[in-house]
């Protein structure tokens, strides 16, 4: 049973507040996209395509400044005054937090037909090459001695999806709510590092070589695999 976990990222939510210093200039336009951690590489490429489109459509240059971090932290930074023209975040809750301040007009969820999302990913495990602990599903992550790396749900949108994927697995396997809570408790007892964002967790696992398994967005795991094809492999859990 697989779930495509929608990243409720509204790709072009224009803030009703236009940050000071951002705006039209004679030589073009500069805007700031406040986004979450694993979208760095995507927007580096997407911004080039968007700039070409903007020039062809409007005859002006446009430069997009990128800001990345944990989705929850990014949302709070905008509420607290961070200059942003566009926000692309991992959770509906994070965008609603900004909407509640009046910086985004109500009705942003209706911008896409059928409440769709611009793009999606799913949750996977990244393990060391050869999968030495034979990790295949969520049950393996609660075994004694397995060191898990995942970001903190308090600050990271990806971490919330990691938690919800684990919860979905627990609900499928256990009828008892107590058993479901016990499963989640064991899982997070095995987490050795709770970074503030998904990219921080990737750095902890991939660069700093900590942990046995990283719970991650599939696109984030694929980025690591492309950089280190001989050191890691992806395991796709049942949920």
Language-model-detected regions and their locations in the chain:
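Alpha-helix termination/capping residues and helix-transition junctions
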Residues: 16, 80-81, 208
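Internal, well-ordered alpha-helical segments in soluble enzyme and binding-protein domains
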Residues: 121, 134-137, 158-166, 201
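Bilobed "Venus flytrap"/periplasmic-binding protein-like clamshell domains
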Residues: 40-45, 154-182
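Ligand-binding pocket segment of bilobal, Venus flytrap-like solute-binding proteins
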Residues: 174-238
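Short, low-complexity disordered leader/linker segments with a strong preference
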Residues: 1-30, 52
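Amphipathic alpha-helical segments that form well-ordered structural scaffolds
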Residues: 45, 49, 140, 165, ...
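N-terminal segment of the mature folded domain
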Residues: 25-155
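Hydrophobic, Leu/Ile/Phe/Ala-enriched alpha-helical segments that form helix-helix packing faces
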Residues: 50-54, 170, 225
């Amino acid at each position: 049973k697989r779930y495509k976990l929608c990243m409720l990222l509204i790709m072009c939510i224009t803030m009703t507040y236009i940050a000071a210093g951002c705006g039209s200039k004679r030589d073009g336009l500069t805007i700031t996209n406040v986004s979450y951690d694993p979208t760095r590489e995507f927007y580096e490429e997407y911004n080039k395509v968007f700039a070409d489109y903007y020039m062809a459509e409007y005859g002006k240059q446009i430069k997009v400044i990128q800001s990345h971090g944990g989705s929850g932290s990014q949302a709070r930074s905008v509420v607290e005054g961070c200059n942003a023209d566009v926000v692309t975040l991992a959770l509906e809750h994070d965008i609603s937090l900004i909407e509640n301040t009046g910086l985004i007009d109500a009705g942003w969820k209706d911008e896409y037909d059928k409440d769709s999302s611009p793009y999606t990913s799913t949750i996977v495990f990244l393990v060391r090459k050869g999968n030495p602990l034979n990790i295949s599903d969520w049950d393996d992550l609660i075994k004694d001695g397995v060191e898990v790396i995942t970001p903190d749900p308090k600050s990271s949108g990806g971490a919330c999806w990691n938690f919800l994927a684990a919860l979905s697995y627990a609900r499928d396997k256990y009828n008892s709510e107590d058993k479901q809570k016990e499963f989640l408790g064991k899982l997070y007892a095995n987490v050795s590092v709770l970074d503030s964002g998904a990219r921080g967790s990737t750095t902890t696992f991939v660069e700093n070589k900590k942990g046995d398994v990283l719970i991650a967005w599939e696109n984030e795991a694929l980025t690591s695999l492309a950089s280190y094809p001989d050191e890691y492999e992806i395991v796709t859990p049942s949920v």
